[in-house]
Amino acid sequence: MAGFERLEKQVAANALHNSGEVSDQPKCHPGTRVAILDHLIAWATALAYTYPIIWLHGPAGSGKSAIQRTVAQLLHKRGLLLASFFFFRTGAGRNSANNFIATIAYQIALVIPATRPHIEQAIARNPLIFSLSLWDQAQALIISPILAILNEPSFNTNQRPRIFIIDGLDECDDPDKQCGILDILCRVLQHLPVPFALIIASRPEHRIRGAFDFGDLNKCSSRLSLDNAYNSDPDIMKFLVDKFSDIRKQHPFRAYPGPRRRSLISWSPKPPDSSSMHQQLIDSSVLFDTTQLSVLMSYLVTLMPEG
């Protein structure tokens, strides 16, 4: 079996940013998260990085994955996305580190074709390479192939794919592997003499936070907190207003207000104008997570007329 065929068999195809499982999930609602997206894209498109790693963190439902999916899509369109991996706790192949390096190497071979022969040679030299440690795999399948082509004329160091995007690291099923992946990615960036960079998102779990607090990872990373750095209320308001507008345009209500409508009104101390509605629906949490949004939208669908 050829080296690239062996590699393909080790790839977690459903973890790619443009796989059906990932790309079908919500991205940032148009006009929301503008400041965060602008910040990440401006950082990613720079020609040099003071800190080559950004850790995007926040609690469940704060929008980390939607932001990562959107950024991956935008960078892919600009030809800057090198590789991505979207972990998911219940997704086969996406919930462990077993296929992580192979999946990254596969994408590198596709977006920088000059690396493919070197990756294939590494697999041919050691057909058991995928049973080695993650670091040994990274050296053979990521670092060495990139180093081998640095002096080739086709490798433009200013206009080339150079951003890794990793999402949901906390959903990897082995906490030790979570920290191992962080260490490996940091070492990969240190071994490459030209600028490459990483945006990684996770919940601020104890082990992950600890890894960012010390050592080389602390020195080469910056942090972007979704629960402190950015006020999400305007984004929530825009999302709700747009969704309410869609419902109003597409599905006129029957008799107003109707019993269920009265039930919704009863949640508010006064008629549900935008400000009071917003306050009543999100005052239980600093962040209005996606679960709450789903519940709200499902309830609103029951208010629509039939037929």
What are these regions (language model features)?
Residues M1-G307:
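Conserved NB-ARC/NACHT P-loop NTPase core of NLR-like innate immune receptors
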